[in-house]
Amino acid sequence: MRGYKIFTGSAHPEFGGEIAKYLGIPLSSATVNRFSDGEINIQISESVRGRDVFIVQPTCAPTNDNLMELLIMIDALKRSSASSINAVIPYFGYARQDRKAAPRVPITAKLVADLLQRAGATRVITMDLHAGQIQGFFDIPVDNLYGSIVFRDYVKSKHLPNPIIASPDIGGVARARYFADQLGLDLVIVDKKREKANVSEVMNIIGDVQGKDVILVDDMIDTAGTMAKAAEVLKSKGATSVIALGTHPVFSGSAYEKIEKGALDEMVVANTIPLKKESSKIKVLSVAPLFAEVIRRVYHNESVNSLFV
């Protein structure tokens, strides 16, 4: 077979290293530099001619820099005659801009999809897209993995006496119900009203949480305002404990302070984005082995269906 290579950008090299270690191959070499005016310059340091290549690069903050770096690396690999170029994007930035939510606004997620394809990506592997329909913005294969596989095993290992799943808002009900069904648990809903971007107001609880160990489920944690306020309300309604599960730890603004000083007992996240700092309340689970297994199967033309269960 042609052989494959794993490259990583500068956004999360540790994640790329984990993938390479799982696969038993070294990370391939690429040099990322910046000119004095800030322009990104990339040089692929080894031959990729005829090879299948996988680029690991979450488009987290600084989002524009990391996205541009990914696009330039794709272009460099295309011009170096790689056989296929697979963009491994653990966290897909701009996914919240998936539709026209107001007059005269862009659909930036579609623009990013177009840019990736135009640059030369032949496949995208990502996790827990904020809006699943973004897969339809692409004309190339998109594997949207579920972080719930890793979170499910963690929840089981805690042996909580009286667990129940909660959605932090109406929009996340489908995601939370899927997770609840996987574990055979009941579901409650936190009904909230969002006053403006990144500011959330929790209203009431739909369901009974008295004496329950509540597990809040969401795809990303941005300012942590939703989760912090939800935890307060849940405990005021009699919840024994509140754990939050969020695939992508964006953690902007005062997120760390809200987690550390708030009512949440634990915040469990995946390592799709590197953390800015550690906290005794934050538990990080690695999803790198899951991505690595998908890469292995894609290269060997094996089905990845079982990894979505």
Swiss-Prot record:
Cofactor binding description: Binds 2 Mg(2+) ions per subunit.
Pathway: Metabolic intermediate biosynthesis; 5-phospho-alpha-D-ribose 1-diphosphate biosynthesis; 5-phospho-alpha-D-ribose 1-diphosphate from D-ribose 5-phosphate (route I): step 1/1
Keywords: ATP-binding, Cytoplasm, Kinase, Magnesium, Metal-binding, Nucleotide biosynthesis, Nucleotide-binding, Transferase
Transmembrane stretches, start-end: none
GO terms, molecular function: ATP binding; kinase activity; magnesium ion binding; ribose phosphate diphosphokinase activity
EC main group: transferase
Alphabetical list of SMART domains matching this protein: Pribosyltran_N
Domain of life of the native organism: Bacteria
Subunit text: Homohexamer.
Protein name: Ribose-phosphate pyrophosphokinase
Annotated organism of origin: Wolinella succinogenes (strain ATCC 29543 / DSM 1740 / CCUG 13145 / JCM 31913 / LMG 7466 / NCTC 11488 / FDC 602W) (Vibrio succinogenes)
